[in-house]
Amino acid sequence: MDIEPTFKGYIEDEDDALLILQATLDGKLKHIPRRPYEIERPYLIVSGSIFVFIEEISGIKRWTDGVSWSPSRISGKFLIYKELDKENAGSNANATSSGSTDSAVITDGTSGARNNPSSSKIKLPPLKNHQFDLPPTMGHSSFESEQDTSISPSNRSNLPLKYTGLVKKTISVKLKRPPFNSIENLHIVSYYSVKDIKQNCLVTPKASPFLKDVRPSQELIVAMGNTTLGNVKNNSTTTGNGPNNINNKSNSSTPLNTVISTNNNSANINAAGSNQFTSANKNYYYKNDESSGYPITQFAPALPSTTLMYTANPPYITQSPDNTNATGMNTHVNNNNNNSNNSSNSNNSNNNNNNNNNNNNNNNNNINNINNVNTNAGNGNNPNRFHNASFAYNTTGDFINPQQQGQISYPFYYTTIPINNPNYYTTQPPNPVTNASTNENQGYSTSSTQHPYYGHPTESQSASAAAGATGTPGTAENVLPVSSMQPLLHQANNNSASSATSTAPYPVYSMNVNVPYYNSSASAYKRAQENTTSNTNAEPSGATSTNSGTMLSNPAYANSQYTPSQVYYQGFPQYAMASAQNPSMYQHQHQHPLPTVYPIATPQQNIMSSGHTLSTIGSDPQHHHYQQEPNDHKNFAMGHANNNILNITNNDTMNNLNTNTSTTTQ
């Protein structure tokens, strides 16, 4: 796998380092997964190359580049190295051997020099001062101080040091990450030449248009402040009104645990000096620790980063869970609510058995029509497409990008690992097992994959109207109360050939959300007692006449302004994500990572329903978005602040995820 520099430019000071690190954590820039190979060094280890690597992800403990460097010296929070002129190393060595014993061993970074008889000690005198007429924006004082600082008082000599002019500048930051206070070691290794700085050839991150909207988080600023090397002083030359001034506290409140960046630029624009995050081509595994909920003896897949919540190019999105892939997350079997309802389920076992027969009969009918449904899977003109724009997928894998089926990525929004279900990380999901107590997985057929779809906990999902789905009208589904807020398996309807009876299944995943009560008439969640003729979006009652697909009565919404709930979105929940510090936004902790995901491209439009009413997003909590009409996102604001609302339009593929801090319309 080829690697590229994270950024092309010059790290002048800590402010620049913060911008580079934050952009990497946001997914705007990419960190590198390995050291450069020897064949890559000639074009990677050059002036202007800036590399960021995360020690826990890349496994890089020691950076090697094959260059002979002087001993390090401290400049603020940075370490500075100068490349030695190998052609003159012999003469320097000879002179040193007859001189003082105060010397330093110079290696080429590959440990080979230590075993090479021709390698010898070189006495290093103070570095020659370099005075350049640099423009203020290029940090004259900062660069000058780097050139003025001597290596060590003991290295002073009249012997001139031969070096090429290439300089290596490094910095490391220890970042503590919630929820387990794990430590990530972030490293920056940058290269520049004295000539390029003199001629103003390299741009600083502060001056880069690509990074103009990046704001270092408070956690990162604190971590940088805790990095101490020598007598540290702030070399920042940014003004108080600069777009990237990290000392502007109003601009530094965005926590690292938010998915949404404040970048207004499209993430796939190849702006000068930028490289975007690209997904790794291999799956990393590591031995997890007890704090994550896994036993020490159990292996779990390593996250790309506990801080890279979202990777912008290309993003990976799950399609329908498929029995041949690791997306069949049967969380319902471990749900506490299922256990709590076992007694009632057992009492109704006779009724369940009767319903099972109906399920089996209906499934037989459905299976007979499977081929008709799957023949046109992925075709936007398919008359059997579900009303919710979902399709039935078969075992051959009707994925948007089938050639990428083996490629795995982890778009984690939080680092919370599902501690109750290690099966999240199995390479082969467990086969559905018939459960007579809960009516789950009835009539499972190996001839066609029947996927575990999850319904919205506060919606009827047409449970009482759809063929094959059991449960009493309006108040229960699969003999479990709808208001119990648990994922329900709509197994019987997955492959129904009739779109009229296929409104239930949604290939969605849950996340825990604190749902604020909005006082807007377009609110998605209204109190039950507000079901009046003047409020068409109020939560309706649980009467039998409740319209299919609308919310049922839920006492949890009636008595609390902020109620914990589980809300389900299809694929990407980012459009509802915002800063956890913004009380007017959804506040959530993503609890269910997506183990197997597939890249999404233009053909994703084929599985979208373009007929959504523009005003329905506020009243439709099941409104599943990849990219919908721009007005949908305007309406989603529902009267509250527009900050950090994700803005996705029809012109975007998921490679073009944007946020807009000023407005959500285009």
From Swiss-Prot:
GO cellular component: cytoplasm; nucleus
Pfam family, one: Gti1_Pac2
Keywords for the protein's UniProt record, in alphabetical order: Cytoplasm, Nucleus, Phosphoprotein
Positions carrying Phosphoserine: 152
InterPro entries per UniProt: Gti1/Pac2
Localization per record: Cytoplasm; Nucleus
Low complexity biased stretches: 90-104, 233-254, 334-384, 460-476
Predominant location category: cytoplasm
Region Disordered: start-end pairs: 90-157, 232-254, 314-389, 425-479, 528-552
Biased composition (Polar residues): 108-121, 139-157, 314-333, 436-451, 530-552
MF annotations from Gene Ontology: DNA binding
Family: Belongs to the MIT1/WOR1 family.
Function of the molecule: Transcriptional regulator of pseudohyphal growth.
Note: Present with 1710 molecules/cell in log phase SD medium.
Protein name from the UniProt record: Transcriptional regulator MIT1
